[in-house]
Curated annotation (Swiss-Prot):
GO terms for molecular function: ribosome binding. Pfam families: PRC_RimM (PF24986), RimM (PF01782). Belongs to the RimM family. This is Ribosome maturation factor RimM. Binds ribosomal protein uS19.
Amino acid sequence: MSSNQQPVVLGKLGSCHGIKGWLKITAYTDSVEGIFDYSPWLIKENGEWREIKVTQWRYQGKAVVALLDGVETREQAQMLTNCEIAILPEQMNDLPADEFYWRDLIGCEVVNTTGYNMGIVDQIVETGSNDVLLVKANAKDSFGKVERMIPFVPEQFIKTVDLQGKQILVDWDPDF
């Protein structure tokens, strides 16, 4: 299964809350509430994904807790502690042409405007001013680099993003 078909992890189930099956939620979405915009969820339990619906959620102090369909006791909830929460890729919102999901950029080849292959996007780091591509350099990098950090600033450094071809064209000196 390609990375674009893999479930998209949005968070994980935390510890139990109370005796009626409530679980604390750790959300990786921009806002904690954002994870509840998606339904149904996929829960990875014993290495297998299964569909589950949230029947209720609420703030509990500074935490967010949820009650899942079919989970009615603390014991049932304990079985789900630390399970990942995901959705299918087709559940994600469509983006404007000039915006990208990070997961789609990971694995893209990065080439500069002179044709030099800078490496592969390994991860993306969120900073205060802009996101930064962490590019794992090729084993035979001419400049002896192991990785490069390239600011994701469209037009200035990021010239084109070809998701179909899995390639990002950058205006970046390979010696940086």
